[in-house]
Amino acid sequence: MCIHFEDILKIQMELITLRFNYFMTRLLVIGDVHGCLIELENLLRKLRYRVEQDRLVFVGDLLNKGPSGAETLSFVNDLKDDGGEVIYVRGNHDEKYLQFYNQFSNRLRKEEKPPRRLCQVWLGPDGHKTINKLKSRDWRLLLSTPLSFQTGNITVLHGGLSSKIHCKPKHLLDSKSFSSKRRAEIKSLMYIRHLRKDGTVPNQNETKGLVPWQDLYDGRFGWVVYGHQPTSCVFHKGKTIGIDTACCYGNRLTALVQEPDSQIYWESVSAKSYYANCSPPKRLRNGATAF
């Protein structure tokens, strides 16, 4: 069989492209883990995660509901110690632990165990167990979490966006000069599910006349990848992609992947069990998996 020069050149170019892509950075965005460490490890294996090449981003809520919250934080810290580029965006459950830390930091720094009932009221049924396992470096990781992360045309945050928040996502933590009302509005990024029709953030107990925040998003921050709202599969609407696929409720843990050539897709693994120490949402929204 004759092999022509053009064929050899084509094969060489394909090999060069494969090598180039291998050493280029992928973006891996992981949905709400909620202490499901086994599933996180399985998902990273499925993705063939490369600690020295890939950029790993979590949409928040590593803690609560699942069985291994403290161990998950420790695992993420180990990835960072191994040289991985790991960005952990703050979720509302992470915020609960930070509020607890701010209130009882002196006691925690002395490694005094807070009362079980106090932890359960503040953090949930497994809060006491998790608090007693957290190390100093775990608290440092939690304290370092940004409210959002932006790279290229993708913005990662936990909850949602309001068009009334005018600053860029990368500036959201630089908020010392903001009014207390503005800071509260910015922190709502962790909690938002719905907005008023004028785009403003509703009060906590407000329910009438609200619309999903995704309906009002105008694309100003590019693609928004978020968690917080558990769905049966990836939820795509407009320029928003929800990747909390309810792993702690026995469904799946999902990662959105952006390849070096900007191709976007997702991978997921099945949950090993129903873990959540609370009832599931009344209805897990159906997702849409096509762009």
What are these regions (language model features)?
Residues 34-38, 64-67, 94-98, 149, ...:
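Active-site environment of divalent metal-dependent phosphoester hydrolases
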Residues 24, 51-54, 83-85, 152, ...:
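A general structural motif
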Residues 183, 192, 196-291:
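Acidic, His/Gly-rich catalytic cores of divalent-metal-dependent hydrolytic chemistry
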Residues 16-23, 48-49, 80, 147-150, ...:
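A short acidic-Thr-Gly-centered motif at the start of a beta-strand
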Residues 32, 61, 91-92, 158, ...:
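Divalent metal-coordination and catalytic microenvironments
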Residues 65-197:
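Active-site neighborhood of divalent metal-dependent phosphoester bond hydrolases
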Residues 4-5, 11-75:
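N-terminal active-site segment of His-dependent metallophosphoesterases
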Residues 29, 150, 154-161, 224-226, ...:
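Short hydrophobic-aromatic micro-motifs
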